[in-house]
Amino acid sequence: MKEEKDILNRDVEIPEVVFRKADAALNQIRANTGSTKATRKVTRIQGRIHHVQAAAVACAVLIGAGGITATAAVIHHLWSRGMQANIQATEEQQKNLTDQGMVTQFDQAYTSANSDLTGMEVTSEGITVKPMEMIADGHFVHLSFQVEGYDLPDGEEPFFETVKVYTGDEETAEDSFVNMNGSFYNGIICDENGNPAYEDGTPLTADENGTTIERYKAEDGTLEYVMTLYKPDPEESLLGQMLHVQMENLGTVNKTMFMNGIEGTWSFDIPVSGKDAAQTYELNAPLENVNVTVLSAALSPISVRVDYEVTGEIQAQEDDNGLPEVGGVVLKDGSRMLYLLDGGQIGYQDDTHAYEISSFDRVIDVDQVQSLLF
């Protein structure tokens, strides 16, 4: 078992627009996590991301040669622009995920008379919403919707006043709860260094007031709403379940205030298809100075789960339970993919066992991963 040690010390400036969206996402998560155990936590994205000591643990046996590099901002799109921003991938990676059975492209289903997914678009008050794509593994579901017919004023941020997502027959049942983080895609992605940029690779620009200019509209004037979903119980998967999605009232938002709303309801029942493509590695690797042993890691192209054993006291703070978090991966060619994690949860299962599940903002080639960075 190879073990690396590495010191990362890097500050990344995050513009106000990204920080504001992180706050909105956190508030949405908090609103949706009332029934989860108190030991679980959602980590807030800070205005500055500071990486300090990181221990890298080997998580795969070397198989063959070769490697991959971090994806660039400008690529050919097979997926919708919002989904591509949510999970950046090369054209080859997009095809590979489709071949693995992890991708459902609803626009193809609409043209198939034999598909159970036909006729899913809903029109209310002249605004049509329809699912575009779904990417799912054993832990996370990414779902994108196209919104057509809404005239978004320049400089405004589109917003659904209410978005509900649940499984099962009863919305209020405990086992129906789904963690959800969703927003309209604003034309901004994070590059391979964790810095925000427009989807065409150009740097962000600001208006005369210094506010970052966001690009919600596609060339055809449509908008795209993208959500990431997972069950609060890390042992439960959404695969094979029926997602009930309801969006109500479309308008704009300014400093958390909903404005100019058009009353409407768009409801969908979406069966979750995908594939649990994770590869699990038994590690039993102690991390230095934190009294934590990494028992195992399960890597899929779009997410990671890590199971820990807590072997002694760890330093916890008010909003941080002190557990280590995955900081990236090292590939077999020696290159690193940092700033990968894009939301999830970390917490205790009992006094000595803990876990982390997190989605990635980029697709990775699991076979080319040599080690994890903490």
Task: Pin down the residues of each PLM region.
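Disordered, charged N-terminal biogenesis/targeting segments of membrane/secreted proteins
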Residues: M1-G47
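Internal signal-anchor transmembrane helix that establishes type II topology
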Residues: V42-V74
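Alpha-helix initiation/capping motif
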Residues: P15, H50-Q53, D365
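Intrinsic structural disorder/low-complexity segments
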Residues: A31, R44, I49, A56, ...
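Alpha-helical, hydrophobic structural elements that either
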Residues: R10, A22, L26, I68-F374
